[in-house]
Amino acid sequence: MRFFVSGMPGVGKTTLAKRIADEVRREGFKVGGIITEEIREGGKRTGFRVIALDTGEIGRLAYVGYGYPRLGKYVIDVEGFERVAIPALSRALRGADLIVIDEIGPMEFKSNEFLKALGLVLKSEKHLLATVHRRLVDRYRPLGEYYWLTPENRNAVFSEILGRIKGLLKEK
């Protein structure tokens, strides 16, 4: 089963993905994939990092600066992103009970290797929890269960998705 979560920036998509990954892991299941976090300096967002859920390895996804490829004010570090994300997704396909991808978005789409890995995940029978950039919702909504996260519903969405995933994994 695939679960896709979207919402406005800062609503809690990454927090939801991390909380669900932690809870599923606590139940004794293997969780793999990636989480993307903001990098902040002096209270300002200066970039993004990617973290492998199974190893904790960190790579840089984007930073404020000069260079290419760009997305808005950010330079995308395709090599830094791929160094962590591609092996993490490959390992998750081989051995995880749940794959988490945070986020499917325009920055990640600058990587052809990520697009290939995402395609393999979507073709697999693995359970997937993915956060999706709001501009890409229409592309992924038909592929699984879809949730629009808001401050008002985020606790209910967390409980619903967690309950569904735990139920699916316990059926195995």
Swiss-Prot record:
Catalytic activity: a ribonucleoside 5'-triphosphate + H2O = a ribonucleoside 5'-diphosphate + phosphate + H(+)
Keyword set, alphabetical order: ATP-binding, Hydrolase, Nucleotide-binding
Pfam families listed in its UniProt record: NTPase_1
CDD domains referenced in this protein's UniProt entry, alphabetically: RecA-like_Thep1
EC number: 3.6.1.15
Record function comment: Has nucleotide phosphatase activity towards ATP, GTP, CTP, TTP and UTP. May hydrolyze nucleoside diphosphates with lower efficiency.
Protein name, UniProt field: Nucleoside-triphosphatase THEP1
